[in-house]
Regions:
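C-terminal catalytic/substrate-binding lobe primarily of soluble NAD(P)-dependent oxidoreductases
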Residues: 4, 135-355
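N-terminal Rossmann-like NAD(P) cofactor-binding module of classical short-chain dehydrogenase/reductase
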Residues: 61, 65-69, 90-91
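Hydrophobic/small residue at the entry helix of a nucleotide-binding pocket
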Residues: 15
Length: 355
């Protein structure tokens, strides 16, 4: 299966709708599927269907050559199984480690590409990181930092829930993979706090789960130190540790998400910070290379989209464009760190990330 045109996009929320629009603009024939699709006119076909039914999905997937799941992570396993059964390409945005492991198992016998974790982090940040590691004869550290924040925060938390509260709670509480001094290990989330500056703005970063995808497995024995941290405004981590651990909200994750979203609803004026830094040796000389960007809202298809929405949707759309063009593998597991950054930036959607 080389070039393909027909793509189903499951879940037409903000990110799914934007991803479908970007794929349509890149020349794909898009079929949007949602349990309760919008009635507003769209430039591609849309239909209502039960996205939780593997049987229903298998029926729909007979009409397409690839599927992008923008559904909540707990629904992705069934979608991946249906795609595997139909022999089509599969892409998703999941940060969930058990879901990804199930998809990795399916990829061993797939006829199409199985590409989980194609969003911002994991996803784009891993593509950037891999390009930096490749610049060294020996890499002693790769530090990946990403944060989606309100541009003009109020209050002590300095935050707004522009992303899934379920996803944020999980990444604040689940253990984090790292490589430390050549050893692959797990550490607690919301630790290892550091000060970071982007465009002169004072920020903090701390460990959160899921952002590395498969990178620890790939770079064990290659990179001495590898970790991922979330960027926030100063003071955020200490308050979240108080909320989850001293007040024991870690035992009531769903309620924690409700409380936080009610207090800090989404904003339209957001900013995504990406700070990727790597150190290592070239011809015996120690060097440091960085990729640092600040992404703000952007208009696509006549609609203004938040930074977190377009960076997430744009990353997966660019990867799908690359698979279509034959510049990526056509079957089996696709890891984000396998994706050449220069070719990513050369795609119609990837150009948005050049900054």
């Amino acid at each position: 299966m080389m070039s393909f045109e027909r793509v189903a996009v499951l879940g037409l929320g903000k990110v799914g709708l934007l991803a479908a629009t970007l794929l349509h603009e890149a020349g794909f024939e898009v079929l949007g599927i949602d349990a309760n699709p919008t009635t507003e006119p769209l430039p591609f076909a849309v239909q209502a269907d039960d996205v939780t039914s593997t049987e229903a999905l298998v029926g729909e997937f007979g009409r397409v050559e690839a599927v992008l799941s923008c559904l909540p992570y707990h629904l992705n396993r069934a979608v991946a199984e249906a795609a595997h059964q139909c022999g089509i390409h599969y892409f998703d945005l999941t940060e969930d480690v058990p879901t990804t492991k199930a998809i990795v198992d399916l990829a061993a016998t797939s006829n199409g590409v199985m590409a989980p974790q194609c969003g911002l982090a994991p996803g784009f940040v891993g593509i950037v990181g891999a390009s930096l590691v490749a610049a060294f004869d020996h890499c002693r550290s790769l530090r990946l930092r990403v944060g989606a924040l309100p541009q003009n925060p109020t209050g002590l938390l300095g935050y707004a829930f522009n992303w899934s509260p379920e996803g944020v709670v999980n990444e604040y509480l689940n253990d984090c993979e790292v490589i430390e001094d050549g050893v692959h290990k797990f550490v607690s989330a919301m630790e290892w706090k550091e000060t970071i500056y982007v465009d002169g703005k004072h920020l903090e970063a701390f460990t959160t789960s899921g952002g590395l995808g498969t990178m620890c497995e790939t770079y064990l024995g290659v990179v001495d130190n590898l970790d991922y941290k979330t960027i926030r405004y100063p003071g955020h981590m200490d308050l979240m540790n108080f909320f989850f651990h001293e007040l024991l909200m870690r035992e009531r994750r769903a309620l924690a998400g409700e409380i936080l979203t009610n207090a800090k609803p989404p904003v339209s004026e957001d900013i995504v910070y990406v700070h990727v830094a790597s150190e290592g040796y070239v011809d015996g000389q120690l060097r440091r290379v960085e990729f640092v960007r600040s992404y703000v809202p952007h208009e696509v298809g006549g609609v203004r989209n938040t930074a977190i929405a377009w960076t997430t949707a744009g990353s997966v759309a660019a990867v799908i464009e690359m698979v279509r063009d034959g510049s990526l593998p056509q079957r089996g597991l696709l890891k984000q760190e396998q994706i050449p950054f220069d070719r990513f930036l050369a795609t119609p959607t990837g150009r948005l990330f050049a900054g």
